[in-house]
Design a protein with these regions (language model features):
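Alpha/beta-hydrolase active-site loop
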Residues: 11, 44-65
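Alpha/beta-hydrolase fold nucleophile elbow
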Residues: 65-78
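The serine-hydrolase catalytic nucleophile loop
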Residues: 5-17, 31
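Conserved alpha/beta-hydrolase
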Residues: 18-38
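Active-site glycine-rich loops that stabilize anionic/oxyanionic intermediates
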Residues: 2-7, 78
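Alpha/beta-hydrolase-fold enzymes
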Residues: 85-165
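Short beta-strand/loop motif that positions the catalytic acidic residue
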Residues: 197-198, 204-206
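Active-site nucleophile elbow and catalytic-triad environment of alpha/beta-hydrolase enzymes
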Residues: 176-194, 208-210
């Protein structure tokens, strides 16, 4: 699975290619509402459906005649690490899980980068999101905020070294979403009950300069 607010060309395809070169059958995909996958509004944040995308991938792979259903695993990169964990908790067909530079999007939107987000700020953002739902409903048009590439996001300065340069930029993806849907992340807790995945193996890949 590709990073949040990315598309499959941004990291996921590379990982799939490397896995294929190692002899595995690999599938990369665009999350619902992103890239070439369907769904409106574009760029919507719906963690439960992001989780479902992993199980949908298992549906597809597990019905190919050349696939061993007992050897299907998932890889989640950055934000997709959390979605991959959540999928593995509830889908026993996933026999192994790996995450790379996993980022807990739920925790980020609850407490901010390095826990700098206050309850007051969070509640203010939830109120703004609620008001934007009325606006979108009455106008029939989604309300978009700044994209993940914009400086309003503290991590943008580092992530733009990839997403806004030749090696990582995809012209069709401005990484914008609807602030109203960000509220869905507040209720996303992928680490809860993670021990239920056992005895299936889990690999967390981390790095100091990821």
């Amino acid at each position: 699975g590709h990073p949040f607010a990315a598309v499959r060309q941004q990291a996921a395809n590379l990982y799939a290619t490397k896995m294929a070169e190692a002899g595995f059958v690999a599938l990369s995909f665009d999350q619902m509402f992103w890239g070439e996958s369907g769904g409106t509004p574009r760029g919507a944040v719906l963690p439960d459906l992001y989780v479902e995308s992993f199980s949908a991938g298992v549906d597809y792979l597990g019905t190919r005649p050349f696939i061993d259903r007992e050897k299907i695993g998932v890889i989640g990169i950055c934000g997709s690490g959390g979605f991959a964990i959540a999928a593995t908790k509830i889908d026993p067909r996933i026999k192994a899980l790996a995450t790379v530079s996993m980022y807990d999007m739920g925790e980020y939107f609850r407490t901010g980068l390095n826990r700098t987000r206050t309850a007051e700020t969070r509640n203010k953002d939830l109120q703004t999101a609620a008001e934007q739902r009325y606006t979108a409903f009455e106008s029939g048009t989604p309300v978009y905020g700044p994209g993940q590439n914009d400086a309003v996001f503290p991590e943008a300065a580092e992530s733009n070294d990839f997403y806004q340069t030749e090696r990582g930029k995809v012209a069709s993806n401005d990484r914008r979403t609807t602030p109203a849907s960000y509220a869905k992340f507040i209720n996303f807790y992928p680490f809860n009950d993670m021990d239920s995945i056992s005895p299936r193996p889990i690999l967390f890949v981390v790095g100091e300069v990821a």
